[in-house]
């Protein structure tokens, strides 16, 4: 028995509904990841763990980073399992631009990381006698944007989307960008509390993510 046109429409509707559920799950997973990542980094939650963990709290940031990496790998693995349907057939120059944008983002992010104390950034435990105060830095890429690591990340994920041109890569780019933008608000509140007028003046002079633009 052959399929008529109405049968084909019905099958397409089922497939589209199934795909939509997969993409909605992807969005939900990004939201959950962002919530966990932010909640565990909040001062209130960290104070609770500090009371519970005692001297072992010095491993908190290390465990936090390990958990973040494991969850991110799981999320990216799920994305790779989604149907890889291209939103458009990209021209060769689009692919070249996308690759260039991606690697510019990666290089900016790597350059930005060099401005951090990597042991502290990764969460390597320090002796209890080590000073905990951080230094207000404005050198290197921080002369041009306040959050160069986030600038590089945004360029990389959008370069990846332009190259892949799939719905799941678009969802990832949007989710990462929105999360970064929201995260900057809370991060800068913390920086203002920590550095006061010096950071307020710095924020007034220097762009957030893109020089002379934003």
What label would you give each PLM region?
Residues 22-36, 131-214:
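Hydrophobic transmembrane alpha-helices
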Residues 29-43, 74, 102-124, 173-191:
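Transmembrane alpha-helical segments that form the membrane-embedded catalytic/substrate-channel core
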Residues 38-55:
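Membrane-interface helix-loop junction between the first two transmembrane segments
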Residues 65-79, 102-105, 146-156:
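Core segments of transmembrane alpha-helices
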Residues 48-51, 80-91:
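Membrane-interface helix termini and inter-helical loops of multi-pass transporters
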Residues 51-67:
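Loop-to-helix transition at the N-terminal end of transmembrane alpha-helices
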Residues 12-15:
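Cysteine-centered motifs
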């Amino acid at each position: 028995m052959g399929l008529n046109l109405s049968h084909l429409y019905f099958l397409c509707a089922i497939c589209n509904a199934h795909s939509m559920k997969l993409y909605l799950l992807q969005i939900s997973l990004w939201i959950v990841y962002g919530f966990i990542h932010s909640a565990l980094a909040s001062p209130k939650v960290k104070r609770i763990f500090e009371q519970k963990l005692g001297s072992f709290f010095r491993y908190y940031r290390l465990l936090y980073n390990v958990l973040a990496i494991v969850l991110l790998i799981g999320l990216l693995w799920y994305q790779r399992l989604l149907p890889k349907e291209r939103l458009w057939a990209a021209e060769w120059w689009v692919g070249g631009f996308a690759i260039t944008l991606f690697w510019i983002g990666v290089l900016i992010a790597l350059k930005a990381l060099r401005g951090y104390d990597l042991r502290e950034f990764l969460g390597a435990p320090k002796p209890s006698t080590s000073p905990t105060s951080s230094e207000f830095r404005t050198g290197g890429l921080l002369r041009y944007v306040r959050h160069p690591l986030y600038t590089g990340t945004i360029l990389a994920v959008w370069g990846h989307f332009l190259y892949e041109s799939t719905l799941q890569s678009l969802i990832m780019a949007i989710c990462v960008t929105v999360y970064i933008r929201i995260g900057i608000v809370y991060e800068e509140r913390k920086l203002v509390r920590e550095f006061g007028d010096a950071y307020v003046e710095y924020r007034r002079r220097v762009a957030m993510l893109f020089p002379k633009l934003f």
